[in-house]
Amino acid sequence: ISADKLKSAFIANMSHEVRTPLNAIIGFSGLMATATSEEEKKMYTDIISENNERLLRLVNDIFDLSQIDAGVLNFVYSEFDANDLLRELEGLFGMRLNENPLVTLVCEAHLEPIMMHSEKQRIIQVLTNLLHNAMKFTKTGEIRFGCRMEGTDEVYFYVSDTGIGIPKEEQEKIFSRFTKLDREMQGTGLGLTLSQTIVHNLGGRFGVESEVGKGSTFLFI
């Protein structure tokens, strides 16, 4: 795909992705100003908060994409227990899944520490992208995520769901920019591109195993 076509795809996609949450924030802010019950106000506040988060993720994706293109994606390495970041994400996504009692979130953290020297925030970013996708495409069943040691010095992370699954012939395409298998789903189509690039920049490997109607497992080392 030429650079011009990529730019056109970017502009067309972003105009929709920016307008949708902005319209929701503006519209529901107006409704909240005239709301009379606390229940009504809470509902509007939740919708505004959800769209604020969506807009922030969009801005972060665009910023990271520009850094990738410029070759200046920033990494800050530190020593940490992989289980800590799993539990952090369990708290965050567990609250969100409370709204859908048909889906169970299973965090497969370990009692024994799994110490690693890597870029903690970037690993959280990748897992967050994968968990967001799992939530979007899983209406019933469960979402599992965790990590385990691979050999003596590699840590293997995974996010598995019982969602719609991805056809074999589409599995490579999902890592292309702006690609969305379901056009009706919200999102920029940048999350998996960014995730794969981050993992590769950390010297790791990124993959997917999926079967239509049974779900998907995304994994990286």
What are the functions of these language-model segments?
Residues I1-M32:
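Primarily the dimerization/phosphotransfer
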Residues G27, I166-F178:
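Short conserved segment of the HATPase_c
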Residues E50-L55, V59:
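Short alpha-helical segment of the dimerization/phosphotransfer core of two-component systems
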Residues S66-Y77:
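Helix-loop junction within the histidine kinase core
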Residues A134-M135:
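Short helix-loop "hinge" at the ATP-lid/N-box region of the Bergerat-fold HATPase_c
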Residues G203-E209:
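Glycine-rich ATP-binding loops of the HATPase_c
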